[in-house]
C-alpha cells in the first residue's frame, strides 16, 4: 500500500508524482490519498488523471467535524464519489471531532453522507491504528464501528469491514 498525505497545496499536481502514481497503478496496486477538506477539488483532479487505478480516500476526506461545517465538504465528497476509481475509507473520524465530543452521534452525519455517496461497495474500514490511541482509543473506534455497521445489512457490513479491502488491496 502506498499513501499520499497532502501537505503542500500543489504537491499532488506535480507531474512527476502523478506519473509515478500511475506506475503504481499499472502494476495493479491501489494508492491511498489523504486530502484536507479544502483540497477535495484537487483530489478530484488527481483522481481523474489517475483513472486507471484504485484510489482510496482516507478518513472520508477529513471532514470538518469540529467546526460542523458540512455543506462544502458534502458537495465535494458527492463530486468525488462520481469517479468510479475512488473508494472512501471509513477511518480516523474521531480525531476530527472537537475535544470531548468524539462519539457516534457526532460523526454520524459525515458517515451517513459518505455511505450515501460511495455506497457499501466503495467503502472500506480502517483502524487508524496507532494514531487512534491519541484519542479515545481503538476499542472505542471499534465500538463506534459496530454501531455504524449495525445499521447496514450483513452483506453491506461485511463489504465495508473486510471484503472491499481484500478486493482493493488484494489481500
Residues of each region from the PLM?
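Distinct, well-ordered alpha-helical segments
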Residues: 9-14, 37-51, 66-79, 101-112, ...
Amino acid at each position: 500500500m502506498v499513501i499520499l498525505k497532502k501537505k503542500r497545496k500543489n504537491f499532488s499536481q506535480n507531474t512527476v508524482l502523478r506519473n509515478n502514481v500511475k506506475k503504481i497503478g499499472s502494476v495493479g496496486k491501489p494508492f491511498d490519498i489523504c486530502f484536507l477538506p479544502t483540497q477535495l477539488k484537487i483530489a478530484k483532479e488527481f483522481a481523474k488523471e489517475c483513472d486507471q487505478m484504485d484510489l482510496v480516500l482516507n478518513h472520508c476526506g477529513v471532514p470538518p467535524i469540529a467546526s460542523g461545517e458540512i455543506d462544502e465538504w458534502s458537495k465535494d465528497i458527492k463530486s468525488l464519489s462520481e469517479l468510479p476509481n475512488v473508494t472512501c475509507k471509513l477511518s480516523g473520524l474521531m480525531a476530527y471531532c472537537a475535544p470531548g465530543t468524539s462519539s457516534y452521534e457526532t460523526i454520524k452525519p459525515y458517515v451517513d453522507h459518505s455511505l450515501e455517496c460511495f455506497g457499501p461497495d466503495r467503502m472500506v474500514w480502517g483502524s487508524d491504528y496507532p494514531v487512534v490511541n491519541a484519542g479515545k482509543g481503538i476499542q472505542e473506534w471499534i465500538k463506534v464501528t459496530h454501531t455504524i455497521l449495525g445499521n447496514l445489512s450483513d452483506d453491506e457490513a461485511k463489504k465495508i469491514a473486510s471484503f472491499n479491502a481484500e478486493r482493493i488491496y488484494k489481500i
